[in-house]
From Swiss-Prot:
Organism: Taenia solium
Pfam families, alphabetized: Ribosomal_60s (PF00428)
This protein's name: Large ribosomal subunit protein P2
Chain positions covered by the region annotation Disordered: 72-121
PTM section of the record: Phosphorylated.
């Protein structure tokens, strides 16, 4: 991640094609050790690629990763729509029409540990 961030900073700073030395200078300026091999690998992998395309590809990959809870579609209007639905529900002892209560499950902390990828590779 640090090599990618340094590469992007070098590009934002006006360097058209950042080199390993640019990455090393940026990282050392903030007190971060730079491994020359990893910097070279990062520069080689990013050479000739459009940064915006890389960001969009990353967003697509992140959207495919499950983060636990499944998103629930909420109609526009949110709570007022729920109140309207409750008002339109049949009154009386008709328990068959009543929606089942949702049980909240406590998620273990381990579910956050593995998101399907390592951000530090």
């Amino acid at each position: 991640m640090r090599y990618l961030a340094a590469y992007l900073l070098a590009q934002l700073g006006g360097t058209g094609r950042p080199q390993e030395s640019d990455i090393k200078n940026i990282l050392s300026s903030v007190g971060v050790e730079c491994e020359q091999e990893r910097a070279k690998l990062g520069v080689d992998q990013l050479h000739g690629k459009n940064v915006r395309d890389l960001i969009n590809t990353g967003k697509e990959k992140m959207s495919a990763v499950s983060f636990g809870a499944t998103p629930v579609a909420v109609p526009s209007g949110g709570a007022p729509a729920a109140a309207t639905a409750a008002a339109e529900a049949p009154k009386g002892g008709d328990k068959a029409a009543a929606p089942p209560k949702e049980e909240k499950k406590e998620e273990s902390e381990e579910s956050d540990a593995d998101m399907g990828f390592s951000p530090f590779d």
